């Protein structure tokens, strides 16, 4: 199990990313706009740097919903490889069965 503080930190990052999504997209559009003046683009870069670091979606880490484990995460299930295996062995995931050939 991951520490509760790590799970809480991840929840905080998701909330900040949602909160600043529009502002961040607006500033990035100005920065990538070739028709904008250099001064406007530079000001947009400076404003983007003033936003909270955790508001960037790239700071988020996929974690297992049950354990909070950051490694071995399977996106399709939202679980770590260990919990997917346990659920599959109990038959809780429809259509998923152990390979045998």
Swiss-Prot record:
The record ties this protein, via Gene3D superfamilies, to:
1.10.287.1480
According to its UniProt entry, one GO biological process term is: translation
List the molecular function annotations (GO) for this entry.
Answer: rRNA binding; structural constituent of ribosome
User: What PANTHER family does its record include?
Assistant: 30S RIBOSOMAL PROTEIN S14 (PTHR19836), SMALL RIBOSOMAL SUBUNIT PROTEIN US14M (PTHR19836:SF19)
Q: What does this protein do?
A: Binds 16S rRNA, required for the assembly of 30S particles and may also be responsible for determining the conformation of the 16S rRNA at the A site.
The UniProt entry's sequence similarity note says:
Belongs to the universal ribosomal protein uS14 family.
> HAMAP family in the record, alphabetically?
Ribosomal_uS14_1
Subunit composition and interactions: Part of the 30S ribosomal subunit. Contacts proteins S3 and S10.
Q: What is this protein called?
A: Small ribosomal subunit protein uS14
Native species of this protein? Klebsiella pneumoniae (strain 342)
Instruction: Report the gene name.
Output: rpsN
């Amino acid at each position: 199990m991951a520490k509760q503080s790590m799970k809480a930190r991840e929840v905080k990052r998701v909330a900040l990313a949602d909160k600043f999504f529009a502002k961040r997209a607006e500033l990035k559009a100005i920065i990538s706009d070739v028709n904008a003046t250099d001064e406007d683009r530079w000001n947009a870069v400076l404003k983007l740097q003033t936003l909270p670091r955790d508001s960037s979606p790239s700071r988020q880490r996929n974690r297992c919903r049950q354990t909070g484990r950051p490694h071995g995460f399977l996106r399709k299930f939202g679980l770590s490889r260990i919990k997917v295996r346990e659920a599959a062995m109990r038959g809780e995931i429809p259509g998923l069965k152990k390979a045998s050939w």
